[in-house]
Each structure stands twice: as C-alpha cells, then as structure tokens.
Swiss-Prot record:
This is Acetylglutamate kinase. The lineage of its organism: Bacteria, Pseudomonadati, Chlorobiota, Chlorobiia, Chlorobiales. It comes from Chlorobium limicola (strain DSM 245 / NBRC 103803 / 6330). Its EC number is 2.7.2.8. Its main location: cytoplasm. HAMAP family: ArgB. Belongs to the acetylglutamate kinase family. ArgB subfamily. The gene is argB. InterPro entries: AceGlu_kinase-like_sf, AcgluKinase_fam, ArgB, Asp/Glu/Uridylate_kinase, NAGK-C.
Length: 304
C-alpha cells in the first residue's frame, strides 16, 4: 500500500469521527434532560416529499422515542389532498390559506389524510424501527371539533374544542408513536378538516408538552441576513411592529406564543429541507432553527 495514500486515508477519517464523537457528547445532557418528556412534532413541507428527507426524519423520530422521549406526530398533507381531488375532478379553493371544504372535499380529506398519508408515515417509521400507530382525530374522540369562524366561506373547516389526552398518553406509555391525522368531529357527528398547525398546538397544550416542533420549509425567523437562534414574546412584538417580521410569518409567530401561553415550555421552528435537522435542533447547543420562549431567560436562551 502506498504510505502516502495510507496516511491521507487515516487522517481524513479522524475529523468526521471526532465530529461525531463531539455531537454524541453534546447530546448526552439533553437526552438525560428530556427522558420521559413529551414532544409534539408538526410534520409538513419538503420533509414529507423528498425520499432522503423522509427517511432522515423517520430515523430522527425513532431515535427520539428510543431514548425515552414521548413523541406525538401531527401531520399535514395538503399537496396530497389536492392531487387526489384533481383525480376525482374536484377543484381545490382556498381562503386565506385554508382549504374550502364541502361534503365532497371532506371525503377526499378523510380518504387522503387518514388513509394514504397517515399510513405511509406509520410504515416509514416502522421501517426504521419505530413502533408507530395511525390515529385520526375521529378515533376515541382524539380531536373534538367545532365549526370554524368563517364557516359560510370555508365550509367544513373546524377549530379544536378538546383533545382526548388519556388516549394519547395511553399510546405513549405503551412505547408507541401516535401519528395523528388532523380531522375531528363535533357533537352532531359532522366531520371537519382542521389546520395541522392548529391541531398540533392544541395537542401540545392539552398534553402539557415540553416542546412543540414545527418541521417546515423555512429555516426559522430571519432578521436581516441571520436566523434568530432564540426569540421571546417582547422581541417578536417589536419585530412585528417594525415590519421585520411580516406577511405569512406573523400568524406563525403569534400562534407560537399562544402555545407558550398555554403552558408549552418551548416552540421550535426548523427547516425540514436539511437532513437530521430535528436531532441537530434538539441535541446541540446551537440548534439549527429558531426557538420561541416566553421571556428572556439566560438558561432558556443558552439551551435548546
């Protein structure tokens, strides 16, 4: 063997091995800290479409469960619903980003979210060693709904009235990963399409979760050229007033702080377009996205 080649190969292996070791050491206190805690993860965006990202996400979720964290997954599926509707000759319409849902469309929503999308996620987690169970908001009154405030325009789009935390806790105690499709029904048996972000927030509050994590297509809250590592409520209000946070990011930020007000300790916004972004956000000091905290606190700022 060429000595020069041998030396080059050996040295090139040391750097990544050291880096992996450092990440594992850095993760250890977080693993201890979060054992037995509950994380609610809203799964959406590119991480649901790209095969590499899907597998990376499934590996991350499975690892969280294996180290003793209770993971509750709430998923979207808007693109899949639109595709199914098109195949059936239905046109998708939206008002302020929410899908107009009539009787035909709610059937498509149920069929796509509870059937195809939900079961695909369960299968993917199972392939990576996770014990997942598919749940819809209709199962065991997991999500009880009420008509939304704009029912005359949106139709069967609902808001969350209550969450059956006993059922979700039962699944978590059994070592399972509940994968929840965001549909629910009211006291009259009417079925509603529920925004996945809103459902995840309500579930996190009801479960008194340690964290709510939004896996999306944005890197976090951007101010100028940088992504904020941490933002508190007062800072967010200032940024909104100054126009630094604007457009579609405003409702996301307001929803995050509403969830904090409901008792969830931290909210995280991370970019699902990066492989293993979930682990990098949770188990490293720097994180990869933006964490939302109720107020400035050095301990909360410095740790994920």
């Amino acid at each position: 063997m060429n000595p020069l080649c041998s030396e080059f190969t050996s040295s090139s292996r040391k750097a990544p091995e050291a880096a992996i070791g450092q990440v594992l050491i850095e993760a250890l206190p977080y693993i201890r800290k979060f054992e037995g805690k509950t994380f609610v993860i809203k799964y959406g965006g590119s991480a649901m479409k790209d095969e590499l990202l899907k597998n990376s996400f499934a590996q991350n979720v499975t690892l969280l469960r294996k180290v003793g964290i209770n993971v509750v997954l709430v998923h979207g599926g808007g693109d899949a619903i639109t595709r199914t509707a098109e195949k059936l000759g239905l046109v998708s319409q939206f008002v302020h980003g929410k899908r107009v849902t009539d009787n035909d469309m709610i059937t498509v929503v149920q069929m796509t979210l509870a059937g195809k999308v939900n079961q695909d996620i369960v299968r993917l987690l199972s392939e990576h060693g996770g014990k997942a169970v598919g749940v819809t908001g209709l199962d065991a009154d997991t999500i009880k709904a009420v008509p939304g405030p704009n029912a005359e325009k949106l139709g069967l789009v609902g808001d969350v009235e209550s969450i059956n935390t006993d059922y979700i806790d039962l699944l978590c105690r059994a070592g399972l990963i509940p994968v929840i499709a965001p549909v629910g029904y009211d006291h009259n048996g009417n079925i509603y399409n529920i925004n996945a972000d809103d459902a995840a927030s309500s579930i996190a509050i009801a479960l008194k979760a340690e964290k709510l994590i939004y896996v999306s297509d944005v890197e976090g809250i951007q101010v100028g050229e940088r992504i904020l590592k941490t933002i508190c409520k007062a800072e967010a209000a200032d940024f909104i007033e100054q126009g630094i946070i604007s457009g579609g990011m405003i409702p996301k930020v307001l929803s995050a702080f509403k969830t904090l007000d409901g008792g969830v300790r931290k909210i995280h916004l991370i970019d699902g377009k990066f492989t293993h972004s979930l682990l990098l956000e949770i188990f490293t000091h720097e994180g990869i996205g933006t964490q939302f905290i109720a107020e400035q606190d050095n301990d909360q700022q410095e740790n994920r």
